[in-house]
C-alpha cells in the first residue's frame, strides 16, 4: 500500500495549486451556462442531453454523452454554487484516486518494488494530465479513468479466481458495471473491455497470436472463451445502446474544429490522420509545448508525401510494429501447454508463466524480496513467478496506449478536434507502463553498477522534470487570460480571439480590439471573431465599422443569428427601418439545425423578434407587433429572460385598449423579474388609468426605490402627480428628473413642460 499512498499523495500535492484557479475555457459552457446544473431543471434531463446541455438527438448536438460527469457537476453546483474551488477539489481528489488505482494495477504486473513505485510516480506527475485535472471539464476523462481501472482490476480478480464460480462471476459483474460507468463518464471508457480481453489472452494465458483460435476452441479453455464472448457481447451492447441513444447519427463539426476531416484531398486527409498519433505520442514523450486548444491550424495539414513530417509517421509505426512483434514473438513460450504455463513441474496457480532465472534475479531491486525463507524456499521466488514477463507487459501496455485512443483517431468517425490533451489521460497509463518496463529491461540488461545507477537516476530525474512541468503548467490554468496567452504560439487565431474576450471583460478596450485583429490576421474568416470585433465597435459607438464586421461575420456564417440581431438594431437606430425589418425577419427564419449552440441561437432569434415587434410598435402597427411578440414567446428557450418581452406585450394591448390582457402581461413581466423597472412604470400607468390610484402610486415609488438614479422613473411619477393635480410635487419630480438625465432630450423637454404648468396656473 505504500507505493499507492505515496503516488496518490504526489498526484494530490502537484495539483494543490489549481484549487485557487477560476473557471476556464470550456468550463463556461459546460458549467456556468449549462441549464442542466440548475435546481429548477429536472435532474432527468441530464440523461437526455449531451455534455453541454443540448438535446442529444438534436442535429447540432456534440453527441458527447457523459451523464455521470454532468451529475457530479450538478452536485457541485448544489453544494457550492459557482464557486470554482469545490469543482477543482473534486478533480484533484479524483486524480489522486486514479493514481492510486493505477499504481495498484502496476503492482499486478511489476510486483511490489521500485518499478511499480516508478510507474505510479510517473503517472501522478505527467504534465499531459494538466488539462484533464486543472480544467474542470476534464473531470470526464479522470472519472472515466477511475472506473476504467476499477473494471480492469475486477477482471484481474475474475481471472485469478476462475474455478470458484460465485466469486469469479461476481468479479466479472463488477467488470461490466464499472465499464458501463466508465463509458457514462466518457465514451472511451468502454474500451476497457477490449483491454481486459488483451490481459486475459496475452498476460494471464500468455498465448501467441497463432495459438489464440486453437486454444479457445479446446474444452479445457471454455472459461477463456466464455469470458471473451461475454466481454464482446457486453461491449457491443453498450456501444449499440450508446449509438441508439444519440439518434444513430454521428456529430457534425465545423471546418475549424478538424480541418483534415473537411479537406477535399484524400491524400491530405490520409497523411494527416496517420501523422496525428505520432504528434500525440510526442506530447507524451516530451510535453514541453502544451495548449488549451489544438484546433484550426495548430497542426498544419500534410498535403504531400514530400512533407518531412511523414518521416515521423514512418518511424512511429515502424517502432510500434517492432514493439508488438517483440512482445508477441517470445521464445520462452515454446513450453506452454494450452495457454497454461508450467513451473517446477506444476501448473501456475494463477496461469501466469514462469520467467528465466536471470529475469527473476534482476527484475526487482528491493532486498526485502529475498528476505523471508520458509521450508527452505524463498517467498520472493514464489511471488516473482506469478508476475508476467516483460513481453506480456509490453503487449498490455501497447493495448492500454492504443485501444483507448482509437476513438480519437478519426478511424470510425470524424472527431471535433485535431489534438486534445485530456483525451490522452487514459492512454498515458500505457505510456507510463511502457517507459517503466523499458527502464526495467535496460536495468536488467546492463551489468556494470554505474550503468544500473544511471538508469535509476535517469528515471528519477524524468519524474522530477515531469513534476516541475506539471506545477508550472498548472499556473497557466489559474485564469483565462494566462491560459490564452500561453496558447498563442500553438494556436494564435483561437488564443488571440479568446484573449480579446477576456480583455474586453476587463474594460481594456484598445487591447481587446488589437487581440481581435490579431486573431483575424491569422484566420480572417472566423465568424465569431468578426462578430466579437463588431460588437466591441458597436459598444463604442463606431457603428459604421461595426456594421462592416457584422456583414463579414454573416458572410462567413450565414446562420449567425446574433450578427443579424445587432445589425438590425444599428439600422433601426439609424432610422433605416425597412432594412432593419428585413434583417430581423431573415434572422427569425434561420433554423437551429446543425448548430453547436442551439440555445444561444434561439435566444438571438427571440431577441430579433422582440426588436421587430418594437419596430412595429413604434410605427403604430400594434396588431403586427402582437403577432411578432407571440411568435417570440413560442420560440424563446428556457434561459431567455422574458420580462421585457412580456412588458411590451402589455404595452401593445394597452394601446389597443385591451386593458385586462395588458394587465395580465404586466403581471407576467413582474413575475419573471420582480425588480423589472419598466414593468413597474407601465403597470402603474395602467392602474392609474383604471382608477386604482393608490396602487399606481406604490408602483411608481417602487420603481424609484429600485433605481434612484434613473430620471425616467421620476418623470413617470411626476406625470402621475400632475394628473392628480399635485402640482408642487409634480414640479419637484420633474426637476429631479431633469437633473439626473440632463442629456436626455425627452426627459428635459417633459420636465420643462411640467414645470411650466404651475406657472401658467
Q: At which residue positions do the language-model features occur?
A:
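Polytopic membrane enzymes that build or remodel cell-surface glycoconjugates and lipids
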Residues: 1-575, 592, 604-606, 611, ...
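Conserved structural position within tetratricopeptide repeats
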Residues: 489, 520-521, 552-555, 586-589, ...
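Structural signature of alpha-solenoid helical repeat junctions
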Residues: 491, 525, 559, 597-600, ...
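TPR/Sel1-like alpha-solenoid repeat signature
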Residues: 496-503, 515, 529-540, 549, ...
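TPR/TPR-like (Sel1-like) alpha-helical repeat modules
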Residues: 584-592, 731-745, 756, 761
Amino acid at each position: 500500500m505504500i507505493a499507492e499512498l505515496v503516488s496518490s499523495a504526489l498526484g494530490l500535492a502537484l495539483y494543490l495549486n489549481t484549487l485557487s484557479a477560476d473557471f476556464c475555457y470550456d468550463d463556461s459552457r459546460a458549467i456556468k451556462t449549462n441549464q442542466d446544473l440548475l435546481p429548477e431543471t429536472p435532474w432527468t434531463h441530464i440523461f437526455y442531453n449531451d455534455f453541454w446541455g443540448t438535446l442529444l438527438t438534436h442535429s447540432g448536438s456534440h453527441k458527447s454523452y457523459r451523464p455521470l460527469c454532468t451529475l457530479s457537476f450538478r452536485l457541485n453546483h448544489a453544494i457550492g454554487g459557482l464557486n470554482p474551488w469545490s469543482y477543482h477539489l473534486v478533480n484533484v481528489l479524483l486524480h489522486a484516486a486514479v493514481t492510486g488505482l493505477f499504481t495498484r494495477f502496476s503492482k499486478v504486473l511489476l510486483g511490489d518494488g521500485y518499478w511499480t513505485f516508478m510507474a505510479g510516480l510517473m503517472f501522478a506527475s505527467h504534465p499531459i494530465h494538466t488539462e484533464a485535472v486543472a480544467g474542470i471539464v476534464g473531470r470526464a476523462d479522470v472519472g472515466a479513468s477511475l472506473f476504467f481501472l476499477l473494471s480492469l482490476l475486477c477482471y484481474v480478480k475474475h481471472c485469478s479466481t476462475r474455478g470458484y464460480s460465485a466469486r469469479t462471476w461476481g468479479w466479472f459483474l463488477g467488470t461490466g458495471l464499472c465499464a458501463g460507468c466508465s463509458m457514462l463518464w466518457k465514451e472511451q471508457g468502454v474500451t476497457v473491455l477490449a483491454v481486459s480481453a488483451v490481459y486475459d489472452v496475452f498476460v494471464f494465458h500468455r498465448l501467441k497470436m497463432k495459438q489464440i483460435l486453437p486454444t479457445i476452441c479446446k474444452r479445457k479453455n471454455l472459461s477463456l472463451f466464455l469470458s471473451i464472448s461475454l466481454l464482446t457481447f457486453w461491449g457491443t451492447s453498450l456501444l449499440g445502446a450508446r449509438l441508439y441513444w444519440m439518434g444513430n447519427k454521428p456529430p457534425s463539426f465545423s471546418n475549424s474544429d478538424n480541418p483534415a476531416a473537411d479537406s477535399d484531398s484524400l491524400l491530405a486527409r490520409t497523411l494527416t490522420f496517420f501523422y496525428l498519433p505520432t504528434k500525440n505520442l510526442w506530447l507524451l514523450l516530451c510535453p514541453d509545448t502544451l495548449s488549451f486548444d489544438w484546433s484550426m491550424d495548430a497542426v498544419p495539414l500534410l498535403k504531400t508525401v514530400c512533407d518531412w513530417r511523414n518521416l515521423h509517421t514512418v518511424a512511429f509505426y515502424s517502432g510500434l510494429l517492432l514493439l508488438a512483434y517483440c512482445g508477441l514473438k517470445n521464445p520462452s513460450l515454446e513450453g506452454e501447454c494450452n495457454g497454461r504455463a508450467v513451473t517446477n513441474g506444476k501448473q501456475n496457480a494463477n496461469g501466469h508463466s514462469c520467467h528465466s532465472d536471470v529475469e527473476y534475479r534482476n527484475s526487482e531491486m528491493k532486498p526485502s524480496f529475498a528476505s523471508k525463507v520458509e521450508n527452505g524456499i524463498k517467498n520472493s521466488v514464489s511471488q516473482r513467478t506469478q508476475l508476467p514477463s516483460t513481453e506480456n507487459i509490453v503487449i498490455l501496455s501497447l493495448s492500454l496506449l492504443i485501444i483507448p485512443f482509437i476513438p480519437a483517431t478519426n478511424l470510425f468517425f470524424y472527431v471535433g478536434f485535431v489534438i486534445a490533451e485530456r483525451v490522452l489521460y487514459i492512454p498515458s497509463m500505457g505510456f507510463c507502463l511502457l517507459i517503466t518496463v523499458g527502464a526495467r529491461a535496460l536495468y536488467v540488461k546492463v551489468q556494470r553498477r554505474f550503468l544500473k545507477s544511471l538508469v535509476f537516476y535517469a528515471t528519477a530525474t524524468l519524474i522530477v522534470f515531469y513534476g516541475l512541468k506539471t506545477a508550472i503548467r498548472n499556473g497557466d490554468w489559474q485564469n483565462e487570460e494566462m491560459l490564452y496567452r500561453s496558447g498563442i504560439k500553438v494556436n494564435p487565431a483561437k488564443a488571440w480571439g479568446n484573449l480579446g474576450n477576456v480583455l474586453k471583460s476587463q474594460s481594456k478596450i484598445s487591447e481587446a480590439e488589437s487581440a481581435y485583429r490579431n486573431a483575424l490576421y491569422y484566420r480572417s474568416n472566423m465568424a465569431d471573431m468578426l462578430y466579437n470585433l463588431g460588437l466591441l465597435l458597436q459598444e463604442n459607438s463606431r457603428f459604421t465599422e461595426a456594421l462592416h464586421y457584422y456583414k463579414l461575420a454573416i458572410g462567413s456564417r450565414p446562420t449567425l443569428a446574433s450578427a443579424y440581431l445587432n445589425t438590425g438594431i444599428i439600422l433601426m437606430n439609424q432610422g433605416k427601418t425597412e432594412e432593419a425589418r428585413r434583417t430581423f425577419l431573415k434572422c427569425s427564419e434561420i433554423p437551429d439545425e446543425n448548430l453547436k449552440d442551439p440555445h444561444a441561437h434561439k435566444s438571438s432569434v427571440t431577441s430579433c423578434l422582440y426588436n421587430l415587434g418594437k419596430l412595429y410598435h413604434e410605427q403604430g402597427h400594434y396588431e403586427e407587433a402582437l403577432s411578432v411578440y407571440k411568435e417570440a414567446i413560442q420560440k424563446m428557450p428556457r434561459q431567455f429572460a422574458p420580462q421585457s418581452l412580456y412588458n411590451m406585450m402589455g404595452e401593445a394591448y394597452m394601446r389597443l385598449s385591451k386593458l385586462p390582457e395588458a394587465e395580465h402581461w404586466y403581471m407576467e413581466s413582474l413575475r419573471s423579474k420582480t425588480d423589472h423597472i419598466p414593468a413597474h412604470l407601465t403597470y402603474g400607468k395602467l392602474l392609474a388609468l383604471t382608477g386604482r390610484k393608490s396602487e399606481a402610486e406604490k408602483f411608481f415609488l417602487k420603481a424609484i426605490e429600485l433605481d434612484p438614479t434613473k430620471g425616467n422613473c421620476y418623470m413617470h411619477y411626476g406625470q402621475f402627480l400632475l394628473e392628480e393635480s399635485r402640482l408642487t410635487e409634480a414640479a419637484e419630480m420633474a426637476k429631479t428628473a431633469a437633473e439626473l438625465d440632463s442629456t436626455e432630450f425627452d426627459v428635459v423637454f417633459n420636465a420643462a413642460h411640467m414645470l411650466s404648468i404651475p406657472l401658467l396656473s
